[in-house]
Amino acid sequence: MAARTLASALVLTLWVWALAPAGAVDAMGPHAAVRLAELLTPEECGHFRSLLEAPEPDVEAELSRLSEDRLARPEPLNTTSGSPSRRRRREAAEDPAGRVAGPGEVSDGCREALAAWLAPQAASLSWDRLARALRRSGRPDVARELGKNLHQQATLQLRKFGQRFLPRPGAAARVPFAPAPRPRRAAVPAPDWDALQLIVERLPQPLYERSPMGWAGPLALGLLTGFVGALGTGALVVLLTLWITGGDGDRASPGSPGPLATVQGWWETKLLLPKERRAPPGAWAADGPDSPSPHSALALSCKMGAQSWGSGALDGL
């Protein structure tokens, strides 16, 4: 029950702290306000204070100004020279007499006045407004540094707030008696690799079981195959050569031309019988009176020659 009450109080405190507006005093104290005033130039100092003294902008009015109806209507041009921020800086730099003050006077007066005004007003200024004023004044680097300080201080406050709910070291609950740990087995010592010796053992090789006749068969087969192959190749080459060249030269091939024939004229007589079948002149007498004589054979051949000449002449006509 007590733990639930403490947890509820912690949640309620954090919720109230989160809903409360974060002030500038959370990020800087009186000394930080003086340092902030010293970091700003005279122009930035006057602009920064004018932005902080200005009333908080109305969100509803800003939204209505950015509405579609207002954007559709053209706004009248501002004929005044310079922006309001520049005009405010120029007015702040001038004294009531109307003359422009020197850099030293403006710097000292503005910084002192800003530091004196910011110290009591820091509690009522929100962090968003202070950071927005620094960015509009042209010093976003100072805004980032103040944001880091704010985050660090908030973290420290949260840690300090939570320390109250943590149990004290002396009032810690007693830890139940733990049983004695079992004795562990003796650890196996790590081997010393440097003290070990490398031993290489070679297994016995098996006996050579092949006989000399194991290579004689392949060798004889190779020689026989080579001889037969060479002989067959040579015979094939010889046959192809003879077939291409037309034989051994004694006779002509079927496609080659034969020997030149002698041409006989029309006045030459052509023998009817070949030389081998002609008989000598004495053989005609021995045959008897009925056998044809050589003169009758000559006359017959002349007659046939004349007929062949006549037929040749007719063919010529």
Swiss-Prot record:
Glycans are attached at N78. The keyword Repeat does not apply. The keyword Membrane applies. The chain crosses the membrane at residues 219-239. Residues 62-73 have a biased composition (Basic and acidic residues). Residues 62-106 are annotated as: Disordered. It comes from the Eukaryota. One of its GO terms (biological process) is signal transduction. InterPro entries: Death_dom. Residues 1-27 form the signal peptide. Residues 240-317 are cytoplasmic. It is found in: Membrane. It is a single-pass type I membrane protein. Residues 28-218 are extracellular. GO terms for cellular component: membrane. Its main location: membrane. Keywords: Glycoprotein, Membrane, Signal, Transmembrane, Transmembrane helix. Residues 66-150 form the Death domain. This is Transmembrane and death domain protein 1. It comes from Homo sapiens (Human).
